[in-house]
Amino acid sequence: MISSTSVYGLKMQWTPEHAQWPEQHFDITSTTRSPAHKVEAYRGHLQRTYQYAWANDDISALTASNLLKKYAEKYSGILEGPVDRPVLSNYSDTPSGLVNGRKNDSEPWQPSLNSEAVYPMNCVPDVITASKAGVSSALPPVDVSASIGSSPGVASNLTEPSYSSSTCGSHTVPSLHAGLPSQEYAPGYNGSYLHSTYSSQATPALPSPHPSPLHSSGLLQPPPPPPPPPALVPGYNGTSNLSSYSYPSASYPPQTAVGSGYSPGGAPPPPSAYLPSGIPAPTPLPPTTVPGYTYQGHGLTPIAPSALTNNSASSLKRKAFYMAGQGDMDSSYGNYSYGQQRSTQSPMYRMPDNSISNSNRGNGFDRNAETSSLAFKPTKQLMPSEQQRKFSSQSSRALTPPSYSTAKNSLGSRSSESFGKYTSPVMSEHGDDHRQLLAHPIQGPGLRAATSSNHSVDEQLKNTDTHLIDLVTNEIITQGPPVDWSDIAGLDLVKAVIKEEVLWPVLRSDAFSGLTALPRSILLFGPRGTGKTLLGRCIASQLGATFFKIAGSGLVAKWIGEAEKIIHASFLVARCRQPSVIFVSDIDMLLSSQVSEEHSPVSRMRTEFLMQLDTVLTSAEDQIVVICATSKPEEIDESLRRYFMKRLLIPLPDSTARHQIIVQLLTQHNYCLNDKEFALLVQRTEGFSGLDVAHLCQEAAVGPLHAMPATDLSAIMPSQLRPVTYQDFENAFCKIQPSISQKELDMYVEWNKMFGCSQ
């Protein structure tokens, strides 16, 4: 009967003659066979009675399970041990029993550590001799080429590296590999860290302490290996008495290490623990050159290695730095580090990055320190003197935009260059990209309207006087670090209203589209010194916008002749630096109902301001927010209140805010106040504005100076001054009084009830 089975998809023919093959070679019941032979016999029975029978459905699953259990028990009951060869161990004469309690079929063990089993040695222990003459005779003489750790029965036809121990005295180790070529190395091989006992002599093969019974009995004989190939490269020659080796690199030019701590040659090997006590551990020579690799020369400056981190931003910076060295990166990339960064404590109000090209980045407030808004900049390169003037303040404050300048130009000064050097970046080849400044740019017809408006802005800029642009850039655009909500003491209700009714509709116009108009104009009214300007700067920081600060009193008193043109130029520059926040203080001086003359300078200023404000309110593409502040809201013309979509009252600071202001101001000085004295200060400053509290703390801080004897103040060191005490505040209360009367406070409350937004 011929049965067939499928193993891994291959059809195999099986006959009973095949099943009888193990019995033709092994006999389980024989008493002369070694345990290893019995194991092979059990494997044959397993294959015949279990695997193939079960595969052909000759037996059931239960029968197969019983057979598997039976032969597994017999298989595990055989303990393979040494038969006719000594074992390098010191076991007892009685063989160990099995854990499962079965009979031990192995032969009694004989201790091998005796005087006859130890080879006499002079200084270095020789390799263990071949197992026996029977094993050696079973293998061809040329087949003893396996290195340490390989099986003596499996001949290798590969040339392996062979080493021999160095000689000590007159003892020479015989070689069993004389007929085989040793592993040879090219002249470029650096042997600085080779073992001191290695040489080019062949190493006798170490036979396995447990040779396979098939090979030891001569049943399986591998074919002889092919003749060894001739050596292609000259080998190195070593003598037997060298203490260490250092082969110079000849194939490749030497190359020094790339960076500190990098060693291409690898670390020297640790001291050998297996060496006899009579032989010292090898002492490696430090490598002087690194062989084998050459690097293409380049003119780039080496980059210092930096620590690896998980920030994607680091990889981008490293990539940008590398590209800068190759000259493939846009030069405008370097502008990102100058821009004013957004506060990290309020990520909800950050403008998202919409992949604005590098060529369209300006020097205004950055969105996230990498994507900046459109900037109004000259087309030609600035001269070194101009660059020093423009960016002189950047060395001390990295958050300040470079477009801000500390130098002030006089009103009568005019630039010697024509206005033609100024062009609007909106009209650049990436002019349409400015629509990506907000998270959700206007779509549809608004794009065509923006293009036409850009042409109009560019034409108006060309017709504007140069010194007006300089005046707006140097004096009206205000520099300063970003302001966060935590920098403003108190005013929690006002902050919440601004966030919900001003910032959210501007930042997420898609979510608020169709529900309400964008609040592009805000009126902040209240007593002086309550933080209206600080709120305007905070809104600009949250929007990532350029902050324009126009003083209404300065327009009327200082710039009365050019106030109309200054307002016009300010809005033009704001359109070029979108998003922008224009803050106008003392707006009551421009919009007062007492202005009656139609052609007066104040009337012309008001007309120009209202025209520009109306353009901002009706424009779909302008990203400009106008914030006006006043301490006299009742003087604003009733017909002009409609221009302000939000009218918010900024009240006096409460007790918590006053405590925060006092602590913040005193941290700059040395003071000695306890909690009770702080509570008294907060109580006595009831009715003070934030500016009044600041004046009080400044007056108290100079108290230690007044207590000093009448000497030269230049010789007094700060450490010589005593701390600020509560008595200094007592003296300051005699000089500083609240600047807001109760009548004014009542007026603000009434006006807020009538015309303000409920808070």
Swiss-Prot record:
Cell wall biogenesis/degradation among keywords: no
Ranges annotated as biased composition (Pro residues): 221-232, 266-289
Tissue: Widely expressed.
Region described as Disordered: spans on this chain: 89-111, 200-237, 258-293, 337-429
InterPro entries: AAA+_ATPase, ATPase_AAA_core, ATPase_AAA_CS, Fidgetin_ATPase, MT-severing_AAA_ATPase, P-loop_NTPase, Spast_Vps4_C
Modified residues (Phosphothreonine): 400
Domain of life according to the entry: Eukaryota
GO molecular function: ATP binding; ATP hydrolysis activity
Family: Belongs to the AAA ATPase family.
Function field: ATP-dependent microtubule severing protein. Severs microtubules along their length and depolymerizes their ends, primarily the minus-end, suppressing microtubule growth from and attachment to centrosomes. Microtubule severing may promote rapid reorganization of cellular microtubule arrays and the release of microtubules from the centrosome following nucleation. Microtubule release from the mitotic spindle poles may allow depolymerization of the microtubule end proximal to the spindle pole, leading to poleward microtubule flux and poleward motion of chromosome.
Name of the featured protein: Fidgetin
Provenance organism: Mus musculus (Mouse)
